[in-house]
């Protein structure tokens, strides 16, 4: 049965907007045509054995450190892509670089505006076509997903759609529960993920979903027993892409999370 409540994305106390000031190493590419077209930031060798799709948080494909994290995956030998998929209407009020939320958007104060906008980005009729274009256009033998916040929802659907070709997914401060906004059952979505999954929730992420006994953690383990989870209690939702790295805990845990995601992705794409 689909969830009847209307879940949000980022819990109270989450990291806010962070401008992207990183000197990128990559380029841009497009996959698909028409409504299914996906513009991407790409980094690394397109002929790599495994491509990693890094699905962004709600500030979209040029949010904070997202492209820097993609470059880190490219440096490890993956073909890394950050898709522009929160782009209905060019993003909310123009978004950030035409995608996602606009700079400085007040998530807490404008929740109704956020909810109205995010409902325009369902899987059925929008993300399914984008995922299809990515899977068809990427040459790599294997594909992995890495999601941040809302991106956790995207990579869960990527895994469900991609079958055995998708070797793993990982999600930092995940918001898979946003599935409920679109009338989906988030637990059922997680159970449909057959590949190993890694969840890295923050200290303020919903423990009923993402704690040691969390329902979505359990559902992902039902899908694949090799799935794993680690809570980061000292940081808040959004820390990897948007957290203040002048804070020692944020800097430390961003690096730890990146290393865990790199190692997990590498391990499960090797076979």
What kind of feature is each model-predicted range?
Residues 1-271:
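N-terminal cap/leader regions of alpha/beta-hydrolase-fold enzymes
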């Amino acid at each position: 049965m689909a969830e009847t409540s209307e879940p949000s994305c980022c819990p109270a106390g989450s990291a806010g907007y962070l401008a992207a000031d990183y000197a990128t190493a990559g380029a841009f590419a497009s996959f698909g045509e028409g409504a299914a077209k996906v513009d991407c930031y790409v980094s690394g060798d397109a002929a790599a054995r495994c491509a990693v799709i890094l699905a962004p948080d709600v500030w979209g494909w040029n949010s904070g450190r997202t492209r820097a994290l993609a470059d880190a995956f490219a440096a490890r030998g993956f073909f890394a892509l950050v898709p522009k998929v929160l782009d209905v209407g060019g993003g909310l009020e123009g978004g950030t670089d035409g995608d996602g939320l606009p700079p400085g958007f007040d998530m807490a104060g404008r929740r109704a505006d956020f909810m109205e906008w995010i409902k325009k980005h369902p899987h059925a009729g929008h993300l399914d076509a984008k995922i299809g274009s990515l899977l068809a256009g990427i040459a790599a033998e294997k594909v992995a997903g890495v999601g941040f916040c809302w991106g956790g929802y995207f990579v869960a659907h990527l895994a469900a759609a991609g079958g055995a070709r998708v070797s793993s997914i990982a999600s930092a401060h995940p918001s898979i529960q946003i599935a409920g906004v679109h009338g989906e059952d988030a637990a059922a979505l997680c159970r449909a993920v057959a590949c190993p999954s890694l969840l890295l929730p923050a200290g303020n992420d919903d423990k009923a979903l993402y704690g040691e006994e969390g329902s979505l953690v359990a559902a992902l383990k039902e899908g694949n027993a090799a799935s794993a989870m680690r809570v980061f209690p000292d940081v808040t939702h959004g820390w990897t892409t948007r957290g203040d790295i002048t804070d020692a805990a944020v800097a430390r845990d961003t690096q730890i999370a990146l290393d865990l995601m790199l190692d997990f992705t590498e391990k499960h794409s090797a076979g």
